[in-house]
Amino acid sequence: MGFSYAPTVQVRSGEERAALVRRTYGLVFLSVIVTVLGSAFALSQEAVLGASAQHPFIMLLCLLAPLWMAQRAAREFPKNLILTFIFTFIEGIFIAPFLYVANRTAPGVVGQAAVLTLAAFGVLSLYAVVSRRDFSAWGSFFMVGLVVLFIAMIINAFVGSAAGGLWIAAVGVMVFAGLLVFDTWRLLRSGMYGQDDYVLAAVAIYLDLLNMFLFILSLLTGGRNRR
């Protein structure tokens, strides 16, 4: 997943690209840590956990606002980092009820999903690095898949089919795996990012990683608990 933008200062050398990659993955790592802290906070506060579970649409609005602002201020340091961390902390609160239900359904499954996600992240990132393929067409293809996935999730929310939820989880893993390869290729190989675009790149990869984790977790719990 990614945002529309025009690079400000194009990366011109291998050293500049290496710096961009370090800053991007550093921010991805910190964003994951902040998300874990957000979930830990919600899980330790019954009132916060209950509010997140009972008012998902309000939480979604609270989530999208800093994401939108982070996109708008993507090149304005330190505002870009502050907004990104606000977004990822709220994201942790937002997914906390799902983590709670998943762990109650199958104790230890959250850790298993995290390990599988990290393994998949490593393999897919390596594939994007070593492959000589041009992945530019993957973005539009998997974005269409994302729209279809979203529609299927809405339909299944009313139908309540466990089998449907399982299929949605499996497709969700594949869609975000494809988007992760695309966004990694875009960072490492495409030359689409400028020197100051590390926040845009990091948020795109973070969202791919997080959603892949959530769909893997849903798959491990039988597709019943995807929020």
Residue locations for each model-derived region?
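A hydrophobic alpha-helical transmembrane-helix feature that marks the membrane cores
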Residues: 1-227
